[in-house]
A protein has these predicted regions:
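Short, conserved loop/turn and helix-capping segments at secondary-structure boundaries
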Residues: 49, 156-160
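Phosphate/adenylate-binding glycine loop and adjacent helical scaffold
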Residues: 143
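Active-site metal-binding motif and surrounding structural segment of the metallo-beta-lactamase
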Residues: 132-138
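Active-site environment of divalent metal-dependent phosphoester hydrolases
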Residues: 67, 148-149
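Extracytoplasmic/periplasmic terminal helices and flexible tails
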Residues: 64, 152-157, 167-187
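Feature for secretory/organellar precursors and membrane-associated catalytic proteins
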Residues: 16-131
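Single conserved hydrophobic/aromatic residue that forms the stacking wall/gate
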Residues: 1-12
Length: 187
């Protein structure tokens, strides 16, 4: 019956349009979510080992610093100050106004030795003493694998301004060591 087959065709068209609408909404929501709420990052180097391994996949929360400032010890994703086309992952060591000193393999913040139980091995700074004063709205970043990290100590633009911090790393969802998708919080 032609009348019946036309009715079925209309039903299929409505169903397909319904699926297209659902898919379009899902794509828009996913885009907005990744653009404004979270960021996905894969760590390309060993600069944060053993906290984060080369190849680990991370989720950062973009809204983390909407109502408060980054804190010393936070692990963040940010625009590399010497080439903003690259994103880096490092630990915040110095916050605005801090005096950072590196001496005999140790980091001192405002004269106090920083407790760093996350370090892979002692830092080798060849006896060189370095001092940095962190400007307003800026941060001093170091990798946890200090002897293999391209960080604030070596950049032409030493500090990361707050507006270049993209997100606070919240958790790892893929662990390279176990080769498994697993959710673990990063501290």
């Amino acid at each position: 019956d032609p009348e019946m087959s036309r009715g079925l065709g209309d039903v299929y068209k409505r169903q397909i349009l319904s699926y297209i609408k659902i898919l379009a909404v899902a794509v828009i929501v996913a885009f907005l979510f990744t653009r404004f709420i979270i960021v996905n990052a894969q760590v390309p180097s060993g600069s944060m080992e053993n906290t984060i391994l080369t190849g680990d996949r991370l989720i950062g929360f973009r809204l983390a610093y909407l109502f408060h400032e980054p804190e010393r010890g936070d692990i963040v994703i940010f625009k590399y100050p010497d080439d903003e086309s690259q994103n880096f992952v490092k630990r915040v060591i110095g916050i605005p106004g801090d005096v950072i000193q590196i001496s005999n393999g140790h980091v001192y913040v405002n004269g106090e030795q920083l407790e760093e139980n996350y370090l892979r091995e002692p830092m080798n700074n060849d006896g060189e003493e370095l001092t940095y004063v962190v400007p307003a709205d800026s941060y001093f970043m170091l990798g946890d694998n200090r002897n293999n990290s391209k960080d604030s100590r070596y950049w032409t633009n030493t500090f990361v301004s707050k507006d270049k911090i993209i997100a606070k790393v919240s958790f790892r969802y893929f662990n390279v060591r176990t080769k498994r998708f697993t959710f673990s919080f990063i501290k």
